[in-house]
C-alpha cells in the first residue's frame, strides 16, 4: 500500500509513523528538509517543521541517525552530549550557537545545507 502511493514511495520499507507524518508535512509545506553534511561527506536529509529551532534540528539529527543505525545495525550508542559539546552546526559560515533561535532567523530555508564544524577550545 505505502510502496504504491506516489507521495510515500520514497520512504524505507520499515517506515515509522513519524517518517510518514514528516513526509506528509513536507508535501503540505508544513515542514522543510535541511541537508546536514557530515565531515565524511555523507549528507543526511533531516525533516523539521517550518518554524523549528536549532534544538529541534539537533533532535531531528539524533532521531535520523538512530533510525539509520537500527536499520543498518551500526554503532549502537552515540554520546550526543559529547557531539554537541565538541561540534557546532554551521550554515553559510555562521555558527548555530543558540538552541532557542529559529532556523529561519539564521536564514535557513528548505533544502539548505548545514555542516558540522569542530569547536575551538576556549583558553
From Swiss-Prot:
Domain Ubiquitin-like, chain residue ranges per copy: 32-123
* Keywords, sorted A to Z: mRNA processing, mRNA splicing, Nucleus, Spliceosome
Compartments reported by the entry: Nucleus
- Gene3D superfamilies per the UniProt record, alphabetical: Phosphatidylinositol 3-kinase Catalytic Subunit, Chain A, domain 1 (3.10.20.90)
- Gene Ontology cellular-component terms listed: nucleus; U12-type spliceosomal complex
Q: Does the keyword Nucleus apply?
A: yes
BP terms from Gene Ontology: mRNA splicing, via spliceosome
Assembly description? Component of the U11/U12 snRNPs that are part of the U12-type spliceosome.
* This protein's name: U11/U12 small nuclear ribonucleoprotein 25 kDa protein
Organism expressing this protein natively: Mus musculus
Instruction: Tell me the lineage of the source organism.
Output: Eukaryota, Metazoa, Chordata, Craniata, Vertebrata
Query: What gene does the UniProt entry assign to this protein?
Result: Snrnp25
